[in-house]
Amino acid sequence: MTRIVKLSVIGCLFLGLALAASGSAPCEGLPSATEAQDSLAPADRLVVLWTSGDRDVAMNMVFMYALNAKRAGWWADVTFIIWGPSAKLLSEDAELQAELGKMKAAGIVLEACIACADRYGASGKLRELGVDVKGMGKPLTAYIKEGRRVLTF
């Protein structure tokens, strides 16, 4: 179902560009990319909560699984949350930053807890890396209550 919606949205975009060039109206009534993403069942959405300051765990499990889960389509939507000591580790480690860039390019949503990032002096660097740094208590609670799957490392 989500593949059909994605193809419909992509097809509509191409058709819309062609029609715009000819002066006709684009597809109406099809869901936007945001609407299609929001229509996913919670069971198809994964939240990876990374809190550990252990580099080996990050490189050899957390980042590897999150990236492959998105690329291989094991989960339709992956949100990666950086919270606690992981914020400090990421802000100081170029190799982990490169891996995070791959995750961003794959379409993984990147978020971080601002309170923890500020404590470690990492908020600025995380923002530079494309991470949405914000209060995470309410968003994480909402993810859990809506039934998303949560993995914690």
Each predicted region: which residue ranges?
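Bacterial N-terminal signal peptides
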Residues: 8-20
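Positively charged n-region of N-terminal signal peptides that target proteins for export
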Residues: 1-6
